[in-house]
Amino acid sequence: KTKTFARISLFLAGLYLCVGWVQLQRAENMTAFLAQTRGHVIETSIVKPTLANLILWRSIYEMNGKFYVDAIRVGFFSEPKVYEGETIEKFIPGIHAPKLPEKSVLADDIERFTHFSAGYIGIQPERPHLLIDVRYSNLPTSTDPLWAIVIDLHRPDQHAQYQLFRDASHEIRQKFLAFLLGEHIN
């Protein structure tokens, strides 16, 4: 009885991974198609599943110092659907922090955050003191961060502060569910 349960569990786990791989390929293909329709050439890209499902994916690609963030819904029995998202400028130390000493506490913190964010660091003009991990957000089309570091370029000897921005409000949950179900979003 235990062996049968273990075999069934192993089969289901393998099936889930295979379905996940197929869905990832579909989402990546849609990302490439979307960039092509925009006349963009992808420099780097990443496609990640959203919370606890294999249907709704967050697509991010880079071109000319900007990240383009979109949601891609790849239903099991439907055509893929794209929800166009936001764009955010990539943080480039030589451009956004040219006077920051290379051998400073803050420069080390920025380098560490960049490493652990796989280089997907964004900066918003209205909040230039925040470095955002673009890979994660409450909504798959948004550049509003789940977390970021707060930097003060006038104090390079001070550590950056880690800040969370989680939002589980009813409005966010409803919008996420609408994306997941493939509904029209205003």
Predicted segments, located by residue:
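Generic signal for short, ordered secondary-structure residues
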Residues: 10-14, 38, 95
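Alpha-helical transmembrane signal-anchor/signal-peptide segments
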Residues: 24-43
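Internal/C-terminal transmembrane anchor helices
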Residues: 2-27
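A short beta-turn/loop motif at secondary-structure boundaries
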Residues: 49-53
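Extracytosolic and intramembrane catalytic regions of membrane-associated proteins
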Residues: 43-44, 54-186
